[in-house]
């Protein structure tokens, strides 16, 4: 990851800590599922497509958790770490996810998916270079690339809904 990007991420995280008092009293702005049920239905259809795509469930949960870490979505982090645990994910891998490059805990395929997740989640800050695409493609066929990308699109959409409307974390119960 380029040094400038790391510095920006550190600054952003520091700013979030400084704003934490505001978040402790967080109140939901809009219950979007009640106000616009059609919007929720559209997002759920995308989620159904991705869930049925054939991507490994564990991979999908890692992607959702990593994008939610980057975006700072507390609600989605609460949800997806709970779902990952229920599905058998280890605490070690969940705790190390933000530093996945520094650990031996993830497969090459998972690392490729996490790298693609970071690139697309931070797309306004990065170019999605051909060498990155080629590297990820070694682990995913064309259909899987589309499915992985749709998974990243979906979680980034959910993150923006939850952050924008301040969906309060802590109430999600895995099924």
Regions found by a protein language model. Name each.
Residues 6-175:
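Hydrophobic alpha-helical segments
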């Amino acid at each position: 990851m380029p040094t400038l990007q790391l510095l920006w991420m550190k600054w952003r995280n520091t700013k979030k800590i400084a704003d934490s008092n505001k978040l402790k009293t967080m109140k939901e702005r809009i219950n979007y599922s009640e106000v616009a049920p059609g919007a929720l239905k559209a997002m759920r259809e995308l989620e159904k497509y991705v869930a049925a795509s054939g991507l490994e469930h564990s991979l999908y949960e890692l992607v959702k958790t990593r994008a939610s870490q980057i975006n700072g979505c507390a609600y989605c982090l609460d949800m997806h770490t709970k779902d990952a645990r229920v599905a058998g994910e280890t605490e070690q891998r969940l705790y190390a996810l933000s530093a996945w490059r520094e650990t031996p805990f993830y497969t090459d395929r998972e690392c490729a998916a996490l790298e693609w997740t970071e690139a697309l989640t931070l797309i306004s800050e990065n170019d999605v270079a051909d060498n990155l695409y080629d590297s990820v493609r070694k682990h995913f066929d064309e259909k899987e690339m589309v499915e992985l990308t749709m998974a990243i699109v979906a979680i980034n959409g959910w993150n923006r809904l939850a952050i924008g409307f301040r969906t309060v974390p802590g109430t999600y119960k895995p099924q």
